[in-house]
Amino acid sequence: MARFQTVTKHARFVYSPYSATEMQGFAQVLADSIRARIQGGQNIYDQAAAPLKPGQSGRRGYPDYKSARGLKPIRDWTWSGHTLRCLKVLTANENRAAIGFLDEALSGRRQTASQIAAFNNRREAQWGVSPRDRQAVLVAFQARPFVMLKAA
C-alpha cells in the first residue's frame, strides 16, 4: 500500500502571510490535537464523551468486547485503530488547509474510514474543533516569527 502524501497546491491569489508548508504544519498540529482528544474519550466541548451502551438482557455489549481485547471501555474510536490512523492533512495551500479522513477501507470491511467517522460522529460529536484544539493551533501560529515591514 502506498503511503499517503498531502497534496500541496499553490494558490493563484494569496491572502495569507503563510506558505503552503506552514499551513500544512498548522493543520497537522490541529489533526494531532483532535486525534489525542478523541483517543482520550472527549467530545468537541472537551467534556467526557457519553458512555458506551451496555449489553441487554444478559448479553455482552460493546464495552465488554473492548475490555476483553484489552482496550478502554470508553467512546474513543479505537478498535483496530484504522479510523484514527486515516485522520490526515488532505490538502494545503497558502490560503487554507483541509484535514479529514482518507477514503480507505480496511481489508475485509465495506465502510471507509470517513464513513465510520461520520457514523460515530452522529452518535456523539467528537470530530470537530474543540476549544483546546483551537488553543493548540493558536499557540502554533504565535510560535511562528512574525515580521513587520515598515514603510520608509
Task: Walk through the language-model features, giving the residues of each.
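Short, Lys/Arg-rich flexible segments
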Residues: 1-152
